[in-house]
Swiss-Prot record:
It catalyses: 2 D-alanine + ATP = D-alanyl-D-alanine + ADP + phosphate + H(+). PROSITE patterns: ATP_GRASP, DALA_DALA_LIGASE_1, DALA_DALA_LIGASE_2. This is D-alanine--D-alanine ligase. The gene is ddl. Mg(2+) 1 binds at D261, E274. Binds 2 magnesium or manganese ions per subunit. GO terms for molecular function: ATP binding; D-alanine-D-alanine ligase activity; metal ion binding. Residues 101-307 form the ATP-grasp domain. PANTHER family: D-ALANINE--D-ALANINE LIGASE (PTHR23132), D-ALANINE--D-ALANINE LIGASE B (PTHR23132:SF23).
Length: 318
């Protein structure tokens, strides 16, 4: 029997356009592999659409809120439909950069020093006074992030104290808490992880942005960033990063796939920045490049993710 796979894409988050590109690429790959595939643009009628299509498995190609945060995973659990990627808890934890940082810190894994600043507390203190205090306590430069956003949405780099208030306001447009992190200069490296109970790290990628910052434009515009495989760091450091990435994957309880982003400082020390449980699968995305470097072409990668989802389903239902 041919497996019918529903590609869940689009959605309602700020990353809708990226999700549509990922979904289209996944859909085409499934067709190449002779799966019976159907595209489902996730909206308020998603339950009706899923039931109507009578899918055997959901391939989650959603990014951001409602797709990566455990929401759609919980819905699929209730509908008893197998799905690709991490479960409810791991998805929710990885989507919240603040929660991820706390777990990484608890596990004793390296991550840049950080501070969580609640909007209500910042406004009570006054945004200006809060900004001055943050810069005084943490020093400059800093990175301010909206914890639950992806694709660098709501993120700012702060090099001057007078820019901190605006950075906080931007983060608060998306979340009630801002994650303020020490900005570490160095080499950006990402580790793509594939597997369930025995995950493996694919070849590492060094990211070099044309603008110096791997922002939304650099991520999704052809020619705006270079993916260097292998990274221009010693093999010993590469192996250490791979081990850290797998440890992070396991600590959060991820499965199927994830991408762990690092910064390597000038002394060669790696720091974990964040975890992405549904990495982009567009023409400019990192995960497919890492798979290709490991000898896995895109259609084969997509089929492998379907197989991992079915394997996990079997594990859960023993």
């Amino acid at each position: 029997m041919t497996l019918k796979v529903g590609v869940l894409m689009g959605g309602r988050s700020s990353e809708r356009e990226v999700s549509l590109k990922t979904g289209e690429a996944v859909y085409n790959a499934l067709k190449v592999k002779n799966y019976l595939a159907v595209k489902i643009d996730v909206g308020l009628d998603v339950v009706e659409r899923i039931k109507e299509e009578r899918i055997d498995l959901a391939f989650i190609a959603l990014h951001g809120r409602y797709g990566e945060d455990g929401t759609i995973q919980g819905l699929l659990e209730m509908l008893d439909i197998p799905y690709t990627g991490s479960g409810v808890l791991a998805s929710a934890l990885a989507m919240d950069k603040a929660a991820t940082k706390k777990i990484i810190q608890y596990e004793g894994l390296p991550t840049p020093p950080f501070m969580l600043v609640e909007k209500k507390e910042a406004l009570k203190e006054s945004l200006q006074a809060c900004s001055e205090r943050i810069c005084r306590e943490m020093g400059l430069p800093l990175v301010v992030k909206a914890p639950t956003q992806g694709s660098t949405i709501g993120m700012s780099f702060v090099h001057k104290e007078e820019d901190m208030a605006g950075a906080l306001e931007l983060a608060y447009d998306y979340d009630p808490v801002a994650l303020v992190e020490q900005f570490i200069r160095g080499t950006e490296v990402t580790a793509s992880i594939l597997g369930n109970e025995e995950p493996v790290a694919l070849p590492l990628i060094e990211i070099v942005s044309a603008t110096g910052v791997y922002d939304y434009k650099a991520k999704y515009t052809a020619g705006m960033s270079d993916h260097i495989i292998p990274p221009r760091i010693p093999e010993k450091q590469q192996n250490a990063i791979k081990k850290l990435a797998v440890s992070t994957f396991k600590s959060l309880g991820c499965r199927g796939l994830a991408r762990v982003d690092f910064i390597v400082d000038k002394q060669g020390n790696p720091f974990i920045l964040e975890v992405n449980t549904i990495p982009g699968m567009t023409a400019t995305s990192l995960f497919p490049d890492a798979a290709r470097a490991a000898g896995i072409e895109f259609p084969d990668l997509i089929e492998k993710l379907v197989e991992l989802a079915m394997e996990n389903c079997g594990i859960r239902r023993r």
